[in-house]
């Protein structure tokens, strides 16, 4: 018998009327979209945390709930005061016990996130340099019905390694009381502690059955093995497009247009007189930046093209950069929408990210449309993107790691250039107003939207919700508490009859780290 269907008023999609409980996450690998553990591999200062954070930002932006579990943060929570590289020596038995506990604590939180908290991907950010360690993580994934995907960052260029240490590691809490030279010397000795036991991934022999990608020399070469599914292929594609070369991305809206003056949304109107002044001011601004080989991108709508024409530079038109399609509400004012389509107006106020205009788009649709633009932006060096308000919000949310809930309310005023400069683990933004007046098109979040997520949304939809949850503080004993409470080494596994666990945490089962 055919299932009864009902249409989601917010997303305008058909869903079955089914009040049965959703499928348990433990069905894992039997499902195409089962949770995945991404396992980072590599020596310190090889960019693992950079890749982890950047990849997590991308996956959350496209709607795949993802979270990083950095074992170093768990270790810093356990060991309140870092002394020296001696903590990482393989013959330091007490420290080894604490490091194992930290890894176990992180894996417990990985399990909780993927099995109970609605997460889809967990990034296990640690060195994981031995085959034995990786085998245990793989066993943990299989036992919990998670897929495992390994990302190894390999770099033998001493200049790149030294640059990574100077840019990121010396500012780490581990070295807050050290000068640069002392921090560099200690960290190089820390790397040496790992090098003796480092076993790289070997897809030709020992690791031929693993799903993995090796990123070699900061993206100069890649080695990919046994990609299992669509999301892993997207991860591979993303990693092959990013680079670490210094560059600047400029984002701005078109100059004020006639519809902006009238308070109308969408359409394809030309620039107002003030919009033309902004185009001239933008041309002068670009000249002052003195950028070599600046690329200029616009949408296919008149206002962005007129703005770009004033620059007297070559520009490329992207259909993907067109403004959000308002469907039946195109070229209406918000007051006209409220009077003509009161229910649609109320639904959009309630959930602006997921709301889809009748015969039009939602912000969620817009993110999917803009993914090729993000990929190409990651490949480029200096770029100026002239676009529209909703489009600019989506792009800015990606670079600033904003959640789906925040995205539709980001302030992107007319006649202002946003200068984005990538830094170690994020992006620095500078807002530059070009001193040309304009109307304000920003609308604050309504009180209804502030009350919480839309109860009509389904958590098991095809595109999962983004996960704005912050990383939990590691729940482990301090180093001092550990030394005082135990003198025996942790067992090399967790059999059911030996319930070794951290206080206040559930057991992982049989899987553990060594």
From Swiss-Prot:
Which parts of this chain are annotated as the region Disordered?
A: 444-475
Record-annotated site: Transition state stabilizer: 253, 260, 388
Q: Which GO terms describe its biological process?
A: fructose 2,6-bisphosphate metabolic process; fructose metabolic process
User: Where along this sequence does the record place binding of beta-D-fructose 2,6-bisphosphate?
Assistant: 253, 260, 266, 334, 348, 352, 363, 389, 393
- What catalytic activity does the UniProt entry give for this protein? beta-D-fructose 2,6-bisphosphate + H2O = beta-D-fructose 6-phosphate + phosphate; beta-D-fructose 6-phosphate + ATP = beta-D-fructose 2,6-bisphosphate + ADP + H(+)
Q: Where is this region: Fructose-2,6-bisphosphatase?
A: 246-514
Q: Which residues bind beta-D-fructose 6-phosphate?
A: 75, 99, 127, 133, 169, 190, 194
Database matches in Gene3D superfamilies: P-loop containing nucleotide triphosphate hydrolases, Phosphoglycerate mutase-like
Cite the EC number.
2.7.1.105, 3.1.3.46
Q: Which GO terms describe its cellular component?
A: cytosol
Protein origin, superkingdom: Eukaryota
Q: Which residues are the active-site ones? A: 125, 155, 254 (tele-phosphohistidine intermediate), 323 (proton donor/acceptor)
- Sequence positions that bind ATP: 42-50, 164-169, 345-348, 389-393, 425
Entry PTM: Phosphorylation by AMPK stimulates activity.
Give residues where Phosphothreonine occurs: 463, 471
Q: Which UniProt keywords apply?
A: ATP-binding, Hydrolase, Kinase, Multifunctional enzyme, Nucleotide-binding, Phosphoprotein, Transferase
SMART domains per record = PGAM (SM00855)
Q: Which residues carry this modification: Phosphoserine?
A: 461, 467
Identify the CDD domains for this entry: HP_PGM_like
Pfam families, per database record:
6PF2K, His_Phos_1
Q: Name one GO molecular function term.
A: 6-phosphofructo-2-kinase activity
UniProt-annotated stretches for the region 6-phosphofructo-2-kinase:
1-245
Role, per record: Catalyzes both the synthesis and degradation of fructose 2,6-bisphosphate.
Subunit structure of this entry? Homodimer. Forms a heterodimer with PFKFB2.
So what family is this one in? In the C-terminal section; belongs to the phosphoglycerate mutase family.
Query: What is the protein's name according to its record?
Result: 6-phosphofructo-2-kinase/fructose-2,6-bisphosphatase 3
